[in-house]
A protein has these predicted regions:
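Short, Asp-centered acidic motifs that coordinate Mg2+ and/or phosphate
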Residues: 271, 303, 331
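Generic enzyme active-site microenvironment
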Residues: 273, 307, 333
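Inter-motif core of Ras-like GTPase G domains
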Residues: 287-311
Length: 456
């Protein structure tokens, strides 16, 4: 579709103050001229300069069906790098759909999902990491997640990777000259310099990889299983974190028989909470199925909040739950601290990252839990304005580049020939170029834009 003029609604569906229909392509002004009539007869769409706006009517044939504003952007000074016209009509799906239909009748083609950002990428307005950041910014729920995406959109990751590429390229140029032209008087690279450059690249990539999980939590949120025995306070905890009575709470054991789901925003982290059935032996087939689902949800979760009744001694079910949390991102919450304590927390402490006394009926405990979750997931240590990796594709490329740089450094230290070092440096450069999009195949481009919606 590259080369055609495309049209789509660029705003979210549903009622609103305005809706925006975006045109992009060489015929954008021609299409706009057929569907938009300036209120000032002396103003002509074809003569509109970039970064200007005109008020007028939207028309289909001779019928005016709405009034609004047309914004004009001349190539290459637009989001896509092409001529772009953004038509702002009144919100509501009927008017916006009619405006799109009028644009299509005037010669535009329907835009594919992500088509505008794809064109921005192909026209050099955005790098690949910046293009991926557009969707991250749209999807962000918290301020830190949005800041991470905005940093990537502003080129933070591209600059960081570019610095590593420049260092390796300079190294490789010298290596290639030394290996390929032995008859020339090319000075051999100093071993200490080789180790220093390769070590610096490896360390930088290690930092990006190390922060990937926490960065992903800020961008995408995390599934959180709330598990524990009946009446330990799981549903009360869900209601505390949600800020309203999402789950039924009664003194009757086994009240929760199926998984109750609720998305909540805790600071800058979105938690997809799953309140599960109480863990105990039961003859009830329905409750037993709920307990089976509880264990399954525990295995799948990216975060576990294990709730224990602090007013009772640990039971066999408590200890089994603790053992299953070993090595997992799990926090033990010893509930009911407002009552005399009977629970020996030392019995479960070895299995958890942290053990916290709480009262799931008090707002103060919510703040304690929010801070603990941020510490455990590493999000409290993240600089939201720094370079960060987004998505499995970027992580995979960074891992390959890091491993290749490490291999080159090991080759130097083992005394292998410089040709072996050169091969590893080449592999690292290839991986970094794939990360930034300089080696972009059509299949990889499709992967980048498959998450996008129509209109972006």
């Amino acid at each position: 579709m590259q080369g055609s003029t495309i049209a789509a609604i660029a705003t979210a569906p549903g009622a609103g103050g305005i809706a925006v229909v975006r045109l992009s392509g060489a015929q954008s002004y021609a299409v706009a001229e057929r569907v938009f009539r300036p209120a000032n007869p002396g103003k002509k769409v074809a003569q509109a300069k970039g970064y200007t706006a005109l008020f007028g009517s939207f028309v289909e044939g001779d019928e005016a069906f709405d009034q609004g504003v047309a914004l004009f952007f001349r190539a290459p000074h637009s989001y896509t790098g092409e001529d772009v016209v953004e038509l702002s009509c009144h919100g509501g799906s009927a008017v916006a759909r009619r405006l799109v239909e009028a644009c299509l009748a005037a010669g535009a083609q329907p835009a594919a999902p992500g088509e505008y950002t794809r064109r921005a990428f192909l026209n050099g307005k955005l790098g690949r990491t910046q293009a991926e950041a557009v969707m991250d910014l749209i999807s962000a729920d918290g301020r830190q997640g949005a800041a991470l995406a905005n940093a990537a959109l502003s080129g933070a990751l591209a600059r960081k990777i570019g610095e590593q590429k420049n260092a390796l390229t300079a190294l490789q140029a010298h290596l290639a000259a030394w290996v390929d032209f032995p008859e020339e008087d090319v000075p051999e690279l100093d071993e200490a310099h080789l180790r220093s450059v390769l070590g610096s690249v490896q360390e930088t990539l290690d930092g990006l990889i190390r922060n990937y999980q926490a960065d992903t939590v800020l961008r995408e949120g995390v599934d959180c299983a709330i598990v524990g025995r009946p009446n330990a306070g799981k549903s009360t905890l869900l209601n505390l974190l949600a800020g309203f009575d999402r789950a039924i709470v009664t003194p009757v054991a086994g009240t929760t028989r199926d998984v109750v789901e609720q998305a909540v925003q805790l600071g800058d982290i979105r938690l997809n909470l799953f309140d599960t059935a109480g863990l105990r032996e039961t003859e009830d087939a329905i409750e037993a199925e709920g307990i089976r689902r509880s264990w399954k949800k525990l295995e799948e979760a990216g975060l576990i909040l294990a709730v224990f009744d602090g007013s009772e001694p640990p039971t066999r079910e408590d200890l089994e739950l603790a053992r299953r949390c070993a090595g997992r991102p799990a926090i033990a919450l010893v509930n009911k601290e407002d009552k005399p304590t009977q629970f020996d927390a030392e019995l479960i402490a070895p299995y958890f990252a942290m053990v916290l006394p709480v009262c799931c009926q008090e707002e103060g405990s919510r703040k304690v839990i929010v801070a603990a979750v941020a510490r455990l997931l590493g999000t409290s240590q993240i600089d939201p304005h720094a370079a960060s990796l987004s998505g499995q594709r970027q992580l995979s490329a960074a891992l390959r580049a890091r491993d290749a740089a490490a291999g080159a450094r090991e080759a130097v230290e083992a005394g292998f020939g410089l040709d072996a070092v050169s091969v590893c440096v080449d592999d690292a450069l290839d991986a970094l170029c794939e990360l930034t999009g300089e080696n972009a195949s059509e299949a990889v481009i499709e992967q980048v834009f498959e998450r996008f919606c129509v209109g972006k």
